[in-house]
């Protein structure tokens, strides 16, 4: 049965791609397809096309006035795909009437963003489990078991995860759960736009470093309706170029997938398709059909129409690093362990005594200089003046006399005097400031830094990597090594020179290749010379990595509150007095670099915060700009 192209797209289940279509009739010019504004706008009767994908071409947005449920929309405008804003996704109030509708409409996949949550209005009785009314159900993956398509789901009860499967035939009213996470527009486009539905979002933050004009009114942080405009991606018979068709093209099509030999079409694979391949299917020979512009890969590795060998896919480690500088924008890098440059240590800054406790190590005694004063009402605790030096040892609990006897967590240190040292006890709640004194002049390889020190760690390139023509790290004023990141890579080589291989990041490469049949492959991949490179990533990619890695580890406990309002008042007064006091000249003799204080998310002190905290960092920063710095709250 013939359908309009729009009707076909509306009913298309993306899990059934690719599909083969035959053009039945429509308004068009005779002859083959031709291109206008990057889209195919004409198809001949009888033309056969294999549909390989349905992508969002652009995003239209409408500003909502009033409540989300009954908002009046203003004139829609295009929201650029690279818009540097952060959004909160509002739950869709329209129910899904079956599991099949959810899987056909919502993106469910291996990504951390591909696990949507729904709840059901009634109890669902399973063989060994009862899903309660309103209980959040996480959809993890879709798979076929014994010929039946099932959805792998899970619920969490008392911190215990319970797994189960639901068939596509399961019916009922399923509603989206509230989502407290914050997303970029790119993430929403890829994972959070249900097919054939709009998405209401709330703008929570906007980067003022964007060069283009802000499409929103000044100080706007309201709700929007996002309306995607799709394009169909496909390939014509005997052609290797990808064609793009707008669903609004006035033609009728017929699905002939079951009766047509798909081998007449060249086999095109995207980066996602390569990711889904099993390890046994590698190596393969392929021709690059399309490659994303603006990638930071060496131009000689991947070019259009170049034949390459994709040897395998695997996980590899990178060190996430950021420039140490007081102004923005900062640059961010992924450094491979194979990097051959050498580093020297740079001093770290610590805003509280609690941060000193986290940073101390068994390898060496942490030596710091105070940059802010601290006065205490307790004789058992040590006052601090600007320029005081301390050797940090360990934390313990001590008793102080204040409205009775109470216990306080302290950091036991040695205060360095001219010729002697004296014991000092600094309360962990102390909101002072310290700069590290570096005595270590050794040059380190990146692998040595990984094994001998804890993140975050400050360094500067002392000897550049001579094996790299342009070492982008050598020009940086300093680097903060923040985290060890594990990511997915493809091992790729030039077909003409298969011995020299490169690690190519799968998640940051938008590439389409055509498999080349009949080409001989290298016999032994174990003899290949693997080359890695330092990858510069965007700020969006950086924050996504920090957010994901932070969600995998438990956060450290927050520093304890100040014990009394009186002492807080006295401390604040003393800090105000110290603002007029310059650092003593003697401090310069310690060869301490004193960069300006970094924001908390870049100094690394919050790098292990839970994902919810990381997601809300934009809101916090915006509040800080309006109302001044926010004080951390934590139990005693």
Swiss-Prot record:
Keywords: Adaptive immunity, Cytoplasm, Developmental protein, Immunity, Nucleus, Phosphoprotein. One of its GO terms (cellular component) is nucleus. Expressed in the thymus and to a lesser extent in the spleen but not detectable in non-lymphoid tissues. Highly expressed in thymocytes between the pre-T-cell antigen receptor (pre-TCR) and positive-selection checkpoints and expressed at low level in mature T-cells (at protein level). Residues 583-636 are annotated as: Disordered. The modification Phosphoserine is found at residue 586. Residues 1-260 are annotated as: CABIT 1. Residues 261-520 are annotated as: CABIT 2. Phosphorylated on Tyr residues quickly after TCR stimulation. Coiled coil: none annotated. Pfam families: CABIT. It is found in: Cytoplasm; Nucleus. Residues 590-600 have a biased composition (Basic and acidic residues). Disruption phenotype: Mice are viable, are born at the expected Mendelian frequency and present no gross abnormalities. They however display a blockade in late T-cell development with defects in thymocyte selection. The number of transitional CD4(+)CD8(int) thymocytes as well as CD4(+) or CD8(+) single-positive thymocytes is lower. Thymocytes show defective positive selection, resulting in fewer mature thymocytes. Negative selection is also impaired. A greater percentage of T-cells have CD4(+)CD25(+)Foxp3(+) regulatory and CD62L(lo)CD44(hi) memory phenotypes compared to wild-type T-cells. InterPro entries: CABIT_dom, THEMIS. Induction: Down-regulated by stimulation through the alpha-beta TCR. GO terms for biological process: adaptive immune response; negative T cell selection; positive T cell selection; T cell receptor signaling pathway. Interacts with PLCG1, ITK, GRB2, and LAT. Belongs to the themis family. Plays a central role in late thymocyte development by controlling both positive and negative T-cell selection. Required to sustain and/or integrate signals required for proper lineage commitment and maturation of T-cells. Regulates T-cell development through T-cell antigen receptor (TCR) signaling and in particular through the regulation of calcium influx and phosphorylation of Erk. This is Protein THEMIS. It comes from Mus musculus. The lineage of its organism: Eukaryota, Metazoa, Chordata, Craniata, Vertebrata.
């Amino acid at each position: 049965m013939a359908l309009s192209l729009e009707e076909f797209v509306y009913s298309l289940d993306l899990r059934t791609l690719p599909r083969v279509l035959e053009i039945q009739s429509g308004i068009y010019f005779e002859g083959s397809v031709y291109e206008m504004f990057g889209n195919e706008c004409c198809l001949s009767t009888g033309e056969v096309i294999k549909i390989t994908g349905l992508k969002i071409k652009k995003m239209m947005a409408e500003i909502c006035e009033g409540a989300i449920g009954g908002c009046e929309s203003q004139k829609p405008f295009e929201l650029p795909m690279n818009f540097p804003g952060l959004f909160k996704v509002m739950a869709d109030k329209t129910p899904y009437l079956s599991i099949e509708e959810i899987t056909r409409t919502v993106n469910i996949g291996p990504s951390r963003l591909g696990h949507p949550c729904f709840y059901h209005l009634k109890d669902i009785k399973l063989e060994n489990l009862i899903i309660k009314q309103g209980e959040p159900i996480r959809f993890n993956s879709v798979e076929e078991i014994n010929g039946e398509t099932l959805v792998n789901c899970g619920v969490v009860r008392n911190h215990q995860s319970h797994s189960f499967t639901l068939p596509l035939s399961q019916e009922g009213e399923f509603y989206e759960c509230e989502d407290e996470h914050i997303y970029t527009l790119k993430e929403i486009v890829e994972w959070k736009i249900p097919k054939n539905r709009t998405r209401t979002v709330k703008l929570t933050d906007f980067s003022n470093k964007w060069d283009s004009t802000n499409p929103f009114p000044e100080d706007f942080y309201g709700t929007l309706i996002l309306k995607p405009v799709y394009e169909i991606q496909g390939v014509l018979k005997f052609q290797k170029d990808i064609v793009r068709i707008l669903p609004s093209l006035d033609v009728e099509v017929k699905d002939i997938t079951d009766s047509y030999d798909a081998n007449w079409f060249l086999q095109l694979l995207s980066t996602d398709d390569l990711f889904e391949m099993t390890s046994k299917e590698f190596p393969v020979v392929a021709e690059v059909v399309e490659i994303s512009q603006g990638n930071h890969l060496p131009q000689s590795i991947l070019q259009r129409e170049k034949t390459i060998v994709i040897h395998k896919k695997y996980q590899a480690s990178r060190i996430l690093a950021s420039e140490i500088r007081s102004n923005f924008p900062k640059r961010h890098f992924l450094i491979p362990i194979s990097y051959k440059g050498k580093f020297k240590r740079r001093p770290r800054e610590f805003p509280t005594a609690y941060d000193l406790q986290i940073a101390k190590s068994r390898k060496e005694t942490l030596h710091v200089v105070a940059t802010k004063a601290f006065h205490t009402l307790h004789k058992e605790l040590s006052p601090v003046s600007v320029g005081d030096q301390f050797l940090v040892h360990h934390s313990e609990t001590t008793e102080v006399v204040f409205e009775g006897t109470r216990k306080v967590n302290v950091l036991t240190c040695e205060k360095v005097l001219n010729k002697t040292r004296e014991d000092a006890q600094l309360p962990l709640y102390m909101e002072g400031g310290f700069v590290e004194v570096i005595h270590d002049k050794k040059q380190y390889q990146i692998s040595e830094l990984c094994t001998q020190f804890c993140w975050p760690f400050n360094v500067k390139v002392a000897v550049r990597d001579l094996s790299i023509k342009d070492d982008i790290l050598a020009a940086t004023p300093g680097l903060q090594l923040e985290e060890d990141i594990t990511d997915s890579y493809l091992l790729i080589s030039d077909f003409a020179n298969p011995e020299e291989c490169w690690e190519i990041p799968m998640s940051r490469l938008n590439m389409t290749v055509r498999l080349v049949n009949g080409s001989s492959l290298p016999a032994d991949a174990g003899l290949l010379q693997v080359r890695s490179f330092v990858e510069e990533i965007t700020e969006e990619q950086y924050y996504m990595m920090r957010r994901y890695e932070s969600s995998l580890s438990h956060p450290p406990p927050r520093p304890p509150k100040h014990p009394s309002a009186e002492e807080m008042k006295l401390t604040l007064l003393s800090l105000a007095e110290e603002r007029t006091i310059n650092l003593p000249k003697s401090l310069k003799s310690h060869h301490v670099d004193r960069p300006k204080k970094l924001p908390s998310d870049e100094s690394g002190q919050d790098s292990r915060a839970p994902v919810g905290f990381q997601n809300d960092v934009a809101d916090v920063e915006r509040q800080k700009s309006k109302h001044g710095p926010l004080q951390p709250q934590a139990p005693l």
